[in-house]
Amino acid sequence: MPADGIPEGIPAEDLLRASIEVALAAVREPLVLAVSGGSDSMALLFAMERWAPDRIAAVATFDHGTGSYATDAASLVAAHGRRLGLTVIRERARRPGVNEAAWRDARWSFLQRVARGFHARVATAHTRDDQAETVVMRLLRGSGARGLAALAAPSPVVRPWLGVSREELTRWLASEGLPFLEDPMNASRYFLRARVRHELLPACEAASPGFRDAMLLIGERAARWRREVEQYLDQAGLVVEHAGRSASLPVEVLEQTTPEGQAVLWAALSARAGVTLDAHGTRAAVRFTSSRRRGAYITVAGGAAIMRTRRAAEQVASDVGADRGIRAPAGVGERFVVRSRAAASEAVEWSGESTTLPRRLGQWRFRRLAAAPAAFDAWHMGLPAGTSVVVRPWREGDRIRSAGAAAGRRVTRYFTESRIPVPDRSQWPVVLVDDEVAWVPGVCRGLAAPSRSGRSELIWYRCEREFD
């Protein structure tokens, strides 16, 4: 099965160049090339440098720390990447993973960090053979249509070689005299993918010629179905925030469909937030759909949170996107939200003087005011001039002295009274003045800052929460 729009039987060089052109046609961002040192990824490195060098932001290579091969492969990538004049980012695992899943998680965490740093997308060297193997592996574990799309599923990851075979890439490298290393673990029958590659697929192909192409066709049909689901989400008022770590839909979209449809939509919505729902999580999400209590939430696999919340009508109308011609739906503001645990881990900390609070800290903005506001609430605070200030995420055990609790009260109680959803709290900013909690924006203000004697001048700020 050739790549989309590319005829069969063309020379290898023309095939590779055309595959890159097709894959990059709809991609605006620069690319971080994921290169391991094997034949597929080294072909990606050399081909991209030859035919699309201006699209390369960096070359990323990850040493899993599993032995001499991993180090040699990373060194090969780094040497040739730099020889070609490309930026190379190399990292070694702090501790070797214990299985394929751990290696994959560590590698993807690294690639995503590098891509964010360059405001780029990741490009991998997955081939047509990888797609066939992945479809078979998904069948073996009982995946539904969503999982059977495998590597062809809609994704921010760019995969130029998905219509190219591993053999074609190796043959091109040999004809050009280009180097690569063969990973000895690819031949090990210890790993499921290797057993599928070397034993199961050849046996099935021998018993039923065309089996491999049939698997590819299943994957393509499933991918087409997934693209239709994704288009439906976009048209139904999807909002993606926090650098892709949070996604939401109007509650009516899910409430007005069948439980079977809800299962499909919850899985797709979760994926937009970087969350993979397992069967248990999908069932829990479907049950949660009938929840009518705003602020209710559940946690699912990986520590991700699903919640029901309300947002201001003007914010929803803006986020849904007037540029797409989508009107905010009836009952505006009530939304189901999926938020990955990673969204909380991206909260950042700042320290400095009270006169120079950061204009922006993550999704929070601090705006300095020229004078004390005529009317103010917990979103406003006056900080004494010349004091040391720290802005950091809330921590379990934080306490604040207030007019109603001069001895101090746990911030978590104020969160509860202000109806701040539990999943939101780990990202919520806390402002400390001289090491004492003085302000939790939008929630409460303390006595710590203004009540100290000899501090007449106050620097006034308003904190605003932004939505990406």
Swiss-Prot record:
Keywords annotated in UniProt: ATP-binding, Cytoplasm, Ligase, Nucleotide-binding, tRNA processing
* Assigned EC number: 6.3.4.19
What biological function has been recorded for the protein in this entry? Answer: Ligates lysine onto the cytidine present at position 34 of the AUA codon-specific tRNA(Ile) that contains the anticodon CAU, in an ATP-dependent manner. Cytidine is converted to lysidine, thus changing the amino acid specificity of the tRNA from methionine to isoleucine.
HAMAP family, per the entry: tRNA_Ile_lys_synt
**Protein family per UniProt:** Belongs to the tRNA(Ile)-lysidine synthase family.
Q: Write down the species.
A: Gemmatimonas aurantiaca (strain DSM 14586 / JCM 11422 / NBRC 100505 / T-27)
Q: Which InterPro entries match?
A: Lysidine-tRNA-synth_C, Rossmann-like_a/b/a_fold, TilS/TtcA_N, tRNA_Ile_lys_synt, tRNA_Ile_lys_synt_N
Q: Does the keyword Transmembrane apply?
A: no
Q: Which reaction does it catalyse?
A: cytidine(34) in tRNA(Ile2) + L-lysine + ATP = lysidine(34) in tRNA(Ile2) + AMP + diphosphate + H(+)
- Coiled-coil segments on the chain, per record: none
Q: Which gene encodes it?
A: tilS
Any Pfam family hit: ATP_bind_3
GO CC field? cytoplasm
Q: What is known of its domains?
A: The N-terminal region contains the highly conserved SGGXDS motif, predicted to be a P-loop motif involved in ATP binding.
Official protein name in the record: tRNA(Ile)-lysidine synthase
Location comes to:
Cytoplasm
